[in-house]
């Protein structure tokens, strides 16, 4: 089986999953957080080298205050458990997004987590927190503009590779496969630049129920995709 090098996931459906069980939305987020750890282990076991998950978007601040506060509390706790998981499984953890809006204690925990795992050689695990792709690109453009004014960058020499050096995902290969759970068929401002040639897989399964078998099913579907990157294969050219 051809295993994608980089898988990106939109972790959707936690709240609806909890509501269907007669539980509060926060319960769903907590269970979804636990499932992230399980899928990280399975991804590495399958041979996936990079896993990026959409944990909290720039638009999620618009949710009710009690839900946002619960998510921030969950995030604080997750930073602790993730450090233990990373140490146990040799994971390298990196947070993408504008963390400056997060409380200082969360920012500190993120820095500690990244520093403690930076030399690990296992799964490269990226967590998108306060992330929005449009916001990411605007921040990148502002940095490039400043460097142009400062004479560090020649505007005429800016290429795709130049722009990518200013993105949160600098140094990380573009995803090969993007998975979205819980039946929604949109990208929700997630990795818009990086997903240019990524294969998409949508499933009705909510994130807390997304299992090893579901991940295997997504990869099996990926194996039946014909990735052309805008071109055509040799046999197709011969048949034109």
Predicted feature locations:
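Flexible, compositionally biased loop and terminal segments
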Residues: 1-240
């Amino acid at each position: 089986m051809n295993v994608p090098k980089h898988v990106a996931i939109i972790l959707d459906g936690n709240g609806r999953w909890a509501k269907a069980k007669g539980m509060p939305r926060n319960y769903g987020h907590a269970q979804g957080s636990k499932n992230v750890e399980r899928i990280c282990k399975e991804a590495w076991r399958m041979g996936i080298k990079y896993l990026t998950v959409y944990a909290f978007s720039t638009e999620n601040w618009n949710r009710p205050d009690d839900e946002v506060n619960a998510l921030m509390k969950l995030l604080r706790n997750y930073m602790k458990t993730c450090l233990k998981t990373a140490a146990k499984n040799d994971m390298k953890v990196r947070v993408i997004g504008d963390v400056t809006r997060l409380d200082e204690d969360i920012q500190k925990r993120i820095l500690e987590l990244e520093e403690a795992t930076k030399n690990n050689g296992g799964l490269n695990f990226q967590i998108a927190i306060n992330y929005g792709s449009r916001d990411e690109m605007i921040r990148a453009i502002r940095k490039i503009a400043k460097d142009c004014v400062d004479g560090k960058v020649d505007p005429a020499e800016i290429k795709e590779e130049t722009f990518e050096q200013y993105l949160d995902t600098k140094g990380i290969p573009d995803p090969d496969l993007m998975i979205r759970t819980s039946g929604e068929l949109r990208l929700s401002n997630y990795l818009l630049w990086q997903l240019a040639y990524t294969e998409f897989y949508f499933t009705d399964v909510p994130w807390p129920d997304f299992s090893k078998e579901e991940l295997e099913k997504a990869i099996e579907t990926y194996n039946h995709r014909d990735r052309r990157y805008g071109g055509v294969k040799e046999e197709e050219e011969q048949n034109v």
